[in-house]
């Protein structure tokens, strides 16, 4: 049993805010909706028990979506709040009781499929499509008109019997078929695949190119008409929308009793696996618009609607084998190879096993009949074992003592197992993929699939080999024509001039990510100084601790790493030294950002501070110049106050940036 404390409460708030960021901003959630909702309920329960602990930035107060900073933010005509979730018939009964108590009678309900997509508000002027907004924070949303206009099922004009001004609410989604085609395209281009259709739809709506958005075949289902007229029911309004040409994929149905509601929920669950798009439940709405207006809404949810959510889809299949992959830093990761099974609209044949300890903890064995579930990740996970089907001859699985790629010994490091060979081919393939990726050197046309082909043909075996590729080499690659060869060689040539921080990131130094690389570049200015840095010099840098400093020294002490860097330079790679403008207005001043900014993203703020000579740190110390606080500022604000460090509101930071 976890001990309940205020520190745990704060940690839970922080965790949920991070999950909100991954879900709404990055479109790459790492937990399932069910897991998120269970954590949110735990938070609500703690706040009910300890109201004195409740912080003003609690995720129970605000509505999720944050602006990406790429599109104009526009106020909604009517609040666009979310719908509360329930996971059991008992909780649904509580909703019925609350509603009946407020109205004085049991109302008629309208039920619709809860399509797993992105909510949008769509407005028409003079019966012509005028604007589309994302949900945003419920009060304001981003203007995504250009991308929504690419949806083929969206009518551009309405018939003459429609009002001149119309606003509808709907869900933008990708069908399973469109999602599968999109991920095939992503794989072929060496790009990261989307975890699920919802993430893909969200990512598409945030594309800056509507031409690219059009290629992805988004779809739309309208679920509401904004109206003050109360003579029609919600169900009738959806009928009007259908008459005007709007797509209604939610299969609405009126239910006049609890029994009818429950029967419909079970009916939809039975057809769930046969639907062409992802759904995660059924939305239950009070059908009368007049009754909806009487019931109103809270700061986060409508009182007249509830979403009955189904448990995450899971499937049972056979664990045929456990293979081991080698990552870019040499870490061995076990992967479950499964008998292919259909799950959430796609065929699943692999599942994540994380590490040896996880396998041992769950006692997962080859040959087991296992339950797999898809959460927020591309690769599903094993959530259980059908022990009744386990063979009496099965044996516990053990991590190999030799690397499966190079057959050198491996060593155990806490929970991970690492190959001891720095030149391991498995690790090198992953290292080259990262080296060329968007987060490192960003070499266009050199995706994972192309790198795998080059590696398989023996044309590359190290990162420096990328810069040695010739026209004749590339013409040997199957499917590579003159234009492909020209484009890739041009991209490689362009990558030969690289900033110090990006080059350091691309080297895959253990424990050194992009922020650590920026800190090193800011402090030392040149690669030569970084390579010769002492432990004390490294430890003096804000954000560099003992573990990271030791890793940097170890990396540059190895002959093979130094030789690799020298070869790159011989092949024409020019590492641009960090230019230090000693007259820059924020030169040397350390900033810490905490909370959510409203006028710009955190990344944009960090870039602007760095452009004026400032530095970014993740922790507050006596050396911090200022802590910039946004919405839901956390423990860093408290630490700044304790140390007497200057605290700036976002408006204060904007004044400083705009003045310079």
Swiss-Prot record:
Q: Where is the BRCT domain?
A: 581-660
Catalytic class of the enzyme: ligase
* Gene Ontology terms for molecular function: DNA binding; DNA ligase (NAD+) activity; metal ion binding
Could you say which residues form the signal peptide?
none
Q: Where does Zn(2+) bind?
A: 403, 406, 419, 424
Q: Domain of life of the organism in this record?
A: Bacteria
**Designated name of the protein:** DNA ligase
What is the originating organism of this protein? Chlamydia muridarum (strain MoPn / Nigg)
Coding gene? ligA
């Amino acid at each position: 049993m976890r001990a309940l404390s205020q520190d745990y409460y704060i940690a839970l708030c922080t965790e949920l805010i991070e999950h909100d960021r991954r879900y709404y901003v990055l479109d790459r959630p790492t937990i399932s909706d069910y897991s998120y909702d269970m954590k949110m309920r735990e938070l609500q329960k703690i706040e009910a028990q300890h109201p004195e602990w409740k912080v003003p930035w609690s995720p129970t107060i605000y509505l999720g979506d944050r602006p990406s900073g790429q599109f104009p933010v526009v106020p909604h005509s009517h609040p666009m709040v979310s719908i509360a979730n329930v996971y059991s018939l008992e909780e649904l009964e509580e909703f019925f009781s609350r509603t009946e108590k407020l109205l004085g009678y049991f109302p008629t309900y309208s039920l619709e499929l809860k399509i797993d997509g992105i909510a949008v508000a769509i407005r028409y002027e003079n019966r012509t499509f005028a604007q589309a907004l994302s949900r945003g924070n419920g009060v304001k949303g981003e203007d995504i008109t250009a991308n929504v206009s690419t949806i083929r099922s969206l009518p551009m004009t309405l018939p003459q019997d429609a009002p001149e001004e119309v606003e509808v609410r709907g869900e933008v989604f990708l069908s399973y078929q469109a999602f599968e085609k999109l991920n095939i395209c992503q794989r072929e281009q060496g790009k990261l695949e989307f975890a699920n259709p919802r993430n893909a739809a969200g990512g598409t709506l945030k594309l800056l190119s509507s031409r690219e958005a059009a290629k992805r075949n988004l779809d739309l289902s309208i679920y509401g008409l904004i109206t003050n007229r109360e003579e029609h029911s919600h169900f009738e309004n959806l009928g009007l929308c259908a008459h005007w040409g709007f797509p209604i994929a939610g299969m609405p149905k009126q239910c006049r009793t609890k029994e009818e509601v429950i029967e419909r929920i079970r009916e939809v669950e039975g057809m769930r696996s046969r639907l062409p798009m992802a759904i995660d439940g059924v939305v239950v709405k009070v059908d009368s618009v007049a009754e909806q207006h009487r019931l109103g809404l809270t700061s986060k949810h409508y009182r007249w609607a509830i979403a009955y959510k189904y448990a995450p889809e899971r499937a049972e299949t056979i664990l045929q084998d456990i293979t081991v992959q080698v990552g870019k830093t040499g870490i061995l990761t076990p992967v479950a190879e499964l008998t292919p099974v259909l799950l959430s609209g796609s065929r699943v044949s692999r599942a994540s096993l994380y590490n040896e300890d996880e396998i041992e903890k769950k006692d997962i064995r080859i040959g087991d009949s296992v339950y797999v579930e898809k959460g927020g990740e591309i690769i599903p996970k094993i959530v259980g074992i059908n022990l009744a089907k386990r063979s009496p001859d099965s044996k516990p699985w053990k991590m190999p003592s030799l690397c499966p790629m190079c057959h050198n010994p491996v060593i155990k490091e806490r929970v991970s197992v690492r190959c001891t060979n720095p030149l391991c081919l498995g690790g090198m393939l992953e290292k080259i993929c990262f080296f060329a990726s968007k987060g490192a050197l960003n070499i266009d046309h050199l995706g994972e699939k192309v790198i795998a082909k080059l590696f398989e043909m023996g044309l590359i075996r190290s990162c420096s080999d990328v810069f040695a590729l010739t026209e004749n080499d590339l013409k040997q690659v199957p499917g590579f024509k003159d234009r492909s060869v020209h484009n890739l060689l041009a991209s490689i040539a362009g990558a030969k001039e690289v900033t110090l921080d990006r080059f350091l990131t691309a080297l895959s130094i253990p424990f050194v990510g992009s922020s650590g690389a920026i800190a090193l570049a800011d402090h030392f200015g040149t690669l030569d100084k970084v390579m010769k840095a002492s432990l004390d010099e490294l430890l003096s840098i804000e954000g560099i601790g003992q573990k990271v400093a030791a890793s940097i020294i170890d990396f540059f002490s190895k002959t093979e790493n130094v030789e690799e860097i020298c070869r790159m330079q011989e092949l024409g790679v020019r590492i641009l030294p960090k230019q230090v403008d000693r007259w820059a207005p924020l030169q040397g001043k350390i900033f810490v950002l905490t909370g959510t900014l409203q006028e710009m993203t955190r990344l944009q703020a960090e870039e602007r501070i760095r452009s004026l000579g400032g530095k970014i740190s993740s922790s507050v110390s006596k050396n911090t110049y200022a802590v910039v606080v946004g919405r839901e500022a956390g423990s860093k604000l408290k630490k700044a106050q304790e140390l007497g460090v200057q605290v700036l509101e976002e408006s204060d930071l904007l004044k400083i940036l705009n003045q310079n």
